[in-house]
């Protein structure tokens, strides 16, 4: 079924991909992504593992109502989370040669 050394070569490639995936998972967990809302008046910085590092709120919003500010913070966080997901997909595609993960399977595993 496999040519000479085919199975061994396949196993070696699988091991190399696994090592690259592990390195990518570490890289993604340590990266920081900024999400924005309100035309940049609220910025949320999160890690690739979705831990919030910073929340920056423009001074002009401190006088506005609390509910609007809460909505802007939530929107900025959601924007940052979306950016993390997009970055993960791009980096994964670079490693897997564009091979898509099965539906429902996400990085990191």
From Swiss-Prot:
InterPro entries: YbaB-like_sf, YbaB/EbfC. Coiled coil: none annotated. Belongs to the YbaB/EbfC family. The keyword Ribosomal protein does not apply. Its main location: cytoplasm. This is Nucleoid-associated protein VV2410. Gene3D superfamilies: Nucleoid-associated protein YbaB-like domain (3.30.1310.10). Homodimer. Keywords: Cytoplasm, DNA-binding. It is found in: Cytoplasm, Nucleoid. GO terms for cellular component: bacterial nucleoid; cytosol. Residues 1-22 are annotated as: Disordered.
